[in-house]
Amino acid sequence: MKIARFSTGDELRYGIVEGLPADEPYPSGESEGRLIVLRGDPLCTPPEATGEIVPLDGVRLVSPVIPRSKVVGVGANHAADGSRAGAAVPGGPVLFLKPNTAVIGPDAPIVLPAWSREVHYEGELAVVIGSPAKDVDAADAGRVILGYT
């Protein structure tokens, strides 16, 4: 299931994505992208459809999640990260924090501080935790993961 957060005006809502947007048609040329609108926040309650359906190309997609407090990042989680920076490879993952304001939507501008000269980019995978969790065993991790983005 693909859950999106979107706006059709001032109100932000969630929906289940079906199909593709108009600018990414199927090989046949069809585009049937739509959102089945959800009630509430699927991070807090199980997804429940309202019955409303809106076309995907008629909405503005925003950040898929609203981080409730912070983003916990994992740096140098493989040998190439450490060696690429010219530093010694750490014995394990290095954690770092980012403010929740660092999470933006697909078409939102990246706002840089005045002193910054460039944007560092790389592919990232975010694991969305769907319930409070601390010191979870690897074997039990699946029970607290809501999804990926």
Task: Give the predicted meaning of each segment.
Residues 68-149:
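Glycine-enriched loop-and-adjacent helix/strand subsegments that border the catalytic/binding cleft
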